[in-house]
Regions:
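Small/polar beta-strand repeat architecture
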Residues: 185-231, 362-404, 412
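Alpha-solenoid helical-repeat scaffolds
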Residues: 190-283, 288-292, 299-305, 310, ...
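Acidic Gly/Asp/Thr-rich repetitive segments characteristic of extracellular carbohydrate-active
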Residues: 5-37
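Ser/Thr/Gly-rich low-complexity blocks that favor extended beta-strand/coil architectures
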Residues: 98, 122-123, 145-201, 341-376
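Extracellular beta-strand-rich solenoid/capping regions of secreted or surface-exposed proteins
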Residues: 24-30, 45-88, 97-116, 124-138, ...
Length: 520
């Protein structure tokens, strides 16, 4: 069955928020296989016309980060694929310009979906490029690329859905990325550019001057990217969906995580481009490019281009829930990181492991008989065995662990790490180029005290990759255990990689059966 978007009023060169919503709702009612075809061209979406939804998205925003009067987790989605099965969406190169803050794409309760040949371009987002054009001992002149104004010695950024004091203590404060003129391929997370500012004034339209007690932190030609760090809206969000493929999708900007999946199965991201629309802008994602949390099946990430992230390129992990109480065969477990809560990814029939938070080693297993989210932060589980459980231990859902293939990808302008991997199933990192990461290229972590991202690695191959620049050791094996009761990670092969790094390119802690060979 073939469906044409223009038959539902989704037409190029027009505002199509409501028409898109109607089209996607109609497609959800059709259970047979279908192909939806869009006309090539430019489409426009106004955020004010989008339907609001309550979305609890892992690793994004916690209740405490919202201001008084705001509704936590209230979210708008430009393209909301909800309850759709057996569908291929061919956007034929169509570009959607989103005016105002929104999650670009949401895929919720979907199955067997292909989304291809799509371009996503938020207009005038709340990030500003500030280029140093002159400096003295006590002041720096910046060229600003977007809308702003100066009021009472403070710098404000303004646009649809935002108007805030960027130079003041707004929420947790404005975040910054710093690209130095002498090393344009590298991006660094810097301190608050405005922390020591002694005043802001406008020299002429598009140019401001900030006074400082000293100006050694920058040079003429340096670029700073300043933005509000609230992770309220995502780029592409997938929840409780299965067999979802994104192919040839270009996403030019997103307000937090570019691609975030939770409680999904069998995901593919191929030949996609997450990067700025033009070369004169260098940031595309205000947080990680990818977060894959408590998914299962196979995660396939191949032939993609990632450029300009204000956090990691990709992170594959589970969640360490902390056991707060035990009553018979019932456990009350809690989300402990303030930016991850409000959803229940643990299902009846899942196998869980009881994990010592000190050693990060598994002490026993059980099967989930029932699972209920009792509030935003707690899940009540009935299990078949609590003999290895203890209050203060963590649990990891062993069923919700995928195999991972990350192959033939390019990662550049990454402000922290290239990859974080904490999955016990097979993970292959092969033939990628990590052009610039200000921290490690690949980190095998595991923690139950900070981000609570589980778990141990059981079979990892890191092969034929090029680590062109890493600000820290390129391959770092570092579980965050507090005591040593034995190796946490195992079966790791680091073979045939090229490291451009002064110092030891591999660091290993608490791992067994690790092979490092034929690297250069």
């Amino acid at each position: 069955m073939v469906i044409y978007a223009h038959d539902y009023g989704v037409l190029p060169n027009e505002e199509v928020a409501v028409q898109l919503e109607n089209l996607l709702a109609a497609v959800a009612e059709i259970k047979d296989e279908k192909k939806i075809i869009f006309d090539e061209g430019d489409y426009y979406i106004e955020s004010a016309k989008l339907q609001s939804r309550m979305l609890y998205i892992t690793n994004t925003v916690g209740d405490a980060e919202f201001k008084n009067g705001e509704t936590p987790h209230k979210n708008r989605c430009a393209l909301a694929f909800c309850g759709i099965e057996n569908a291929e969406f061919d956007f034929c190169g169509a570009e959607f310009y989103i005016n105002g803050k929104a999650t670009n794409v949401a895929v919720i309760d979907c199955k067997n979906l292909l989304i291809e040949n799509l371009k996503l371009t938020p207009k005038n987002p709340n990030i500003r490029k500030m280029t140093v054009i002159a400096k003295s001992l006590f002041s720096v002149d910046f060229k600003i690329d977007g809308d702003y104004y100066v009021k009472n010695n403070a710098l404000y950024f303004k646009g649809i859905d935002y108007d805030y004091n960027a130079s003041g203590q707004y929420r947790f404060a404005t975040h910054l990325a710093h690209i130095k003129a002498k090393s344009p391929k590298q991006v660094w997370r810097t301190g608050k550019l405005f922390k020591s500012a002694m005043g802001v004034s406008e020299i002429k339209p598009g140019v401001i001057r900030i006074k400082y007690p000293r100006t050694a932190f920058c040079a003429v030609g340096d670029r700073f990217y300043a933005f509000d760090c609230l992770r309220q809206y995502a780029g592409i969000f997938l929840d409780k969906s299965e067999n979802i493929t994104l192919q040839n999708v270009h996403q030019h900007f997103n307000y937090s995580l570019a691609y975030v999946a939770q409680d999904c199965k069998d995901l593919t991201l191929k030949s996609c481009r997450f990067a700025p629309k033009t070369e004169d802008f260098e940031i595309a994602s205000l947080a990680d490019f990818m977060q894959v949390c408590m998914c299962r099946g196979h995660i396939d990430v191949e032939n993609n281009y990632f450029d300009g992230a204000c956090d990691d390129c990709a992170n594959f992990h589970g969640i360490h829930f902390i056991i707060e109480s035990i009553s018979g065969n019932k456990l009350t477990v809690a989300f402990k990181h303030p930016q991850t809560h409000g959803f229940n990814p643990i299902s009846e029939g899942d196998e869980i492991g009881y994990i010592s938070t000190k050693s990060l080693l598994e002490k026993g297993r059980a099967t989930v008989l029932s699972s209920k989210l009792t509030d935003e932060y707690h899940i009540e589980l009935e299990v078949n065995d609590t003999s290895a459980a203890a209050e203060g231990f963590a649990i990891e859902d062993i069923t919700k662990i995928p195999t991972v293939l990350f192959k033939n990808n390019l990662a550049k302008h990454i402000i922290t790490r290239g990859l974080l991997i904490t999955v016990r199933n097979k993970a292959v990192v092969e033939s990628n180029r990590f052009e610039s990461c200000s921290m490690s290229g690949v980190l095998l972590s595991d923690d139950a005290a900070n981000w609570f991202e589980s778990g141990f690695c059981g079979d990892v191959l890191i092969k034929n990759n090029v680590f062109e620049f890493c600000g820290e050791v390129p391959v770092l094996i570092k579980p965050e255990n507090k005591v040593n009761e034995g190796p946490v990670h195992k079966n790791i092969k680091i073979i045939g990689n090229t490291f451009n790094y002064k110092g030891n390119p591999v660091s290993i802690k608490c791992a067994e059966n690790t092979v490092v060979e034929n690297n250069k």
